[in-house]
Each structure stands twice: as structure tokens, then as C-alpha cells.
């Protein structure tokens, strides 16, 4: 018989949605715990392609933070600390006698010689290759491919590993939102170093302003504090040459202190145009059949040359200064070109390269490293043995017992970020800093009206294209004229409120 009454779907729909709400996270956790699916994405977009929207969305929402190690307790943390303390060396320098340390993140930097199918008409990165030949260098294992700069950066600055975090997680946007975190900056601050970040992109990208405060940096000069006039050929990114002068400002601002300056480039950032952009490019490629990809590779290798010129300008400028200095430079991940393991001479798309430079006559000691080991290795070579995690790597990273090494790192990492901080005796040894934006002081020296009264001129120092004018805490439209002059045409209402 046919039912002719109304069918009520609402209750069924709500029950079904409730079931999905419960079932999907449970299924996600089971799948991860049994290794059916990945619990960490090195490339979020690729992860969505591989595992689909439902699992990927569920895992990025549900799977955050670190799982508590089964053996996490005070005694086991103290045992790890005791092992480190029995082997660690004493720091032999301080914030006056120590060398300046410069760390340079080379955005999406990949040595073209590492790509099996790619041929370039001439070497676009001769400075890089010269430094690789003459100073300590090696492969660098990074946690991401094609994107996710902040996660390589997190590993490098903190010595902590992304392998313990959730699917597609950015610690800058999760745990570091509310928790301070020991880093190379806080470690060096303890012995008197001044610590800086210089980056020609937006300060709030990846929530960096907050993260750098949580990691203990003193200053952060982002593009908003720079007078940027030159951009890459595709118009997307500032060129990197401005970073040299901005980095020198960090040294000049603290003449009585040694400096740690972290430089983040952006000129080689994707996307890479599949249409010709550079007229008569100096560097051309072969070995790529698709015309669009050939154009993309041509653009990329020419931008690599710009990065190489930046490296030369930086090291040339440092050579002129009478200060002991060591520089470490590394690629944060491979470019977004769809590279596979088989395309790489290393056989691994998670391997980039790092190089160094110094004016101290340090011996060349090549080693392949993980990103979270890089600065422990660098500081070790100059007699700096500070910090819980950096000392852990310095004493344990060459252990033949890899499992024990990773287990110890897991314990300390959980203890610092999510646990009771037994390794700090329960105290907050590395509180967040009062981060100062920029080196140059921005100030207003005078404000005057035009003769007609419809324009207000603001005079001062160190204005940029990103400077904003506020009247009574309300932003008004303004125009940048120079580093010393802005003007605005406030509305009659704004004028009344400013009286």
C-alpha cells in the first residue's frame, strides 16, 4: 500500500548529522593510529588530493598538538636532562665576545644541479656553489614540500620537530598563540646577544609577529617598516636586495652587543608564471617538454640568480666589517613545481641544501642535517652551548641509537609545549619578549594644514608606503610622499573630532 501522509525528515537528518559528527573524528583517529593514513601533511593541498576532503578536513580540525608520550613523567624527563648535562660543554663566549650569527632562509631555493631532468645554459647560482665548495655545507631534511615555510622555520628556530604535530598543523597558529617557546633567540639572549628578524613580506603572515615574540626575539623588521621600491618581474614580491641594508641596521643598532639576525627572503616565492615574463632571459632551460612548465622553470632559475646575487652582496658587505661573523643559509622547501623523488639526485623531495660562510677561519665540516639540528650545529662550531633543546641536539644528534634520540626529543618537546615543564623545574624560563617592530624609530615631528585647509601634512621620520594615519583612533585615507612626509584629506567629521 502507498503511504499518502507527510514524511518528517528533520529528525532523521539531525540524527544522521550527529552520527557523522561523532563517527568521522573517531574514524580519523583510528585510521591515523593504525597508519592507514598519514597523520602529518608536508603539503596540505597534496594531502587533500591524496586523502580527500572529508578525512583531510576532519584531521586538520581534530588532530592538533602533540600526543602525550606514554613514558612521559618527571623522572624520565630528568633522566634525559641528566644524560645531556653529563655530556654538554661550557659556553666559551658571551654577548660581547661571541660572533655575530646570521641565519638566512632562502625561499623555495633549490640547486638546479639537483634536478635530474633540468639543464640550464649556464650556472645561475655561482656564489652558492663557491660557498658550498669552500665552507661547511650539506643536505637539509625539511618537513614540508612546495609550501609551509613557517614549519621549516619553526623547526630551525626552536630545534623542535614537526613530526609530532597534527595533520597540516602550523604551530605558529596553534600552540604558540598562547604558549611561549624556547628558541635560538631566547637561548642567545641569555648570554647577552641581541636578536632580530628581517623579512621583506608582511609581518602578520603566518602570525609571525606573535610567534617571534613568543620565541623571545627583540626586534622584527617586516616590509611595513621598509621603503620597498623594487619588485620581482611578476610583480608579486619585493626583491631581496633590500634585506642587506636592513640586516646591517641590526648590527649598527647594537654596537656593544653580538647579534643573531634571522633573514627571510621572498624573491623566489611561487607561483611561477607559465607565460613568458622576462624579456630575453639570461638563463634558459631545456629538458622540459611542456611549454608552460618551461616558462615557469625559466622564470624560476632567473630568480635563483637574483637570490645568488643577494648572497654575494650580503657576504661582500659582511667581509667589510671588522666583526667575527658566521652565516648559515638554507632552502626552506623545494619550489611548487610538482617534483617527485625520482626527479631529484638526492632521491628525496624533502631534502634541500644549506651552505655557510664565515670570516673566522673555521674548518669545513660537511654534514647532512635535519632542519631542527641546523642551529645546534652552527652554535656548536663557535663555542655556544645554551638551551635545553639546542644542548640536547649537540650532545645526542650523533648517537647511534636513533630511536632513543627521537624518544628523548619527543619527551622534551612535549614537556616544554604541553607538559609540566619538568626540564625547567616547573618555571617559565623563557617568557615572551616585548617585540619591537623595526630598528628605525618612526615619529611625527610636525602636523600642518594646507592653505585651503582641506589637506593635512604629517612630517616625521621613517615613514613607508605602508604607514597609516589615524585621527582619534580611526584610520583615515592617507598618501605617502616620502620617508619624511605623509598627507591626508580628513573629512569634516574627522576634523571636528581632532579639535
Residue ranges and their predicted role:
Residues 1-99, 119-139, 174-178, 182, ...:
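N-terminal secretory/membrane-targeting segments
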Residues 89-96, 103-106, 111-483:
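Solvent-exposed soluble domains appended to multi-pass membrane proteins
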Residues 487-494:
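Conserved small/polar residues in nucleotide/adenosyl-binding loops
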Amino acid at each position: 500500500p502507498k503511504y499518502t501522509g507527510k514524511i518528517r525528515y528533520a529528525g532523521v537528518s539531525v540524527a544522521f548529522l550527529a552520527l557523522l559528527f561523532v563517527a568521522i573524528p573517531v574514524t580519523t583517529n583510528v585510521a591515523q593510529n593504525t597508519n592507514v593514513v598519514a597523520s602529518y601533511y608536508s603539503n596540505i593541498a597534496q594531502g587533500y588530493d591524496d586523502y580527500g576532503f572529508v578525512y583531510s578536513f576532519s584531521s586538520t580540525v581534530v588532530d592538533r598538538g602533540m600526543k602525550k608520550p606514554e613514558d612521559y613523567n618527571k623522572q624520565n624527563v630528568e633522566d634525559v636532562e641528566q644524560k645531556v648535562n653529563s655530556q654538554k660543554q661550557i659556553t666559551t663566549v658571551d654577548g660581547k665576545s661571541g660572533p655575530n650569527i646570521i641565519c638566512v632562509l632562502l625561499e623555495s631555493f633549490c640547486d638546479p644541479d639537483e634536478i635530474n631532468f633540468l639543464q640550464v645554459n649556464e650556472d645561475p647560482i655561482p656564489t652558492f656553489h663557491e660557498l658550498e665548495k669552500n665552507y661547511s655545507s650539506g643536505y637539509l631534511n625539511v618537513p614540508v614540500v612546495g609550501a609551509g615555510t613557517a614549519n621549516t622555520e619553526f623547526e630551525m628556530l626552536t630545534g623542535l620537530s614537526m613530526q609530532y604535530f597534527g595533520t597540516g598543523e602550523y604551530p605558529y597558529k596553534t600552540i604558540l598563540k598562547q604558549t611561549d617557546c624556547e628558541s635560538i633567540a631566547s637561548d642567545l639572549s641569555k648570554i647577552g646577544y641581541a636578536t632580530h628578524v628581517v623579512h621583506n613580506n608582511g609581518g602578520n603572515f603566518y602570525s609571525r609577529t606573535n610567534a617571534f615574540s613568543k620565541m623571545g626575539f627583540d626586534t622584527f623588521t617586516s616590509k611595513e617598516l621598509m621603503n620597498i621600491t623594487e619588485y620581482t618581474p611578476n610583480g608579486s614580491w619585493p626583491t631581496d636586495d633590500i634585506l642587506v641594508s636592513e640586516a646591517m641596521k641590526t648590527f649598527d643598532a647594537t654596537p656593544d652587543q653580538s647579534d643573531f639576525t634571522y633573514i627571510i627572503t621572498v624573491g623566489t616565492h611561487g607561483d611561477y608564471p607559465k607565460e613568458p615574463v622576462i624579456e630575453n632571459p639570461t638563463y634558459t632551460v631545456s629538458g622540459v617538454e611542456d611549454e608552460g612548465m618551461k616558462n615557469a622553470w625559466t622564470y624560476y632559475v632567473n630568480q635563483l640568480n637574483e637570490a645568488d646575487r643577494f648572497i654575494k652582496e650580503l657576504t661582500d658587505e659582511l667581509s667589510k666589517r671588522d666583526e667575527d661573523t658566521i652565516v648559515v643559509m638554507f632552502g626552506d622547501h623545494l619550489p611548487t613545481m610538482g617534483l617527485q623523488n625520482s626527479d631529484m639526485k638526492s632521491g628525496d623531495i624533502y631534502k634541500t641544501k644549506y651552505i655557510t660562510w664565515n670570516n673566522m677561519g673555521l674548518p669545513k665540516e660537511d654534514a647532512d642535517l635535519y632542519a631542527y639540528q641546523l642551529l645546534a650545529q652552527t652554535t656548536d662550531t663557535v663555542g655556544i652551548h645554551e638551551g635545553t633543546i639546542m644542548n640536547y641536539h649537540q650532545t645526542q644528534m650523533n648517537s647511534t641509537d636513533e630511536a632513543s634520540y627521537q624518544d628523548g626529543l619527543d619527551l622534551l618537546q612535549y614537556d616544554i609545549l604541553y607538559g609540566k615543564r619538568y626540564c625547567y623545574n616547573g618555571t617559565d624560563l623563557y617568557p615572551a619578549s616585548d617585540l619591537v617592530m623595526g630598528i628605525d624609530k618612526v615619529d611625527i615631528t610636525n602636523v600642518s594644514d594646507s592653505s585651503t585647509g582641506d589637506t593635512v601634512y604629517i612630517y616625521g621620520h621613517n615613514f613607508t608606503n605602508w604607514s597609516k594615519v589615524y585621527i582619534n583612533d580611526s584610520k583615515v585615507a592617507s598618501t605617502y610622499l616620502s620617508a619624511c612626509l605623509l598627507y591626508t584629506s580628513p573629512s569634516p567629521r574627522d576634523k571636528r573630532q581632532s579639535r
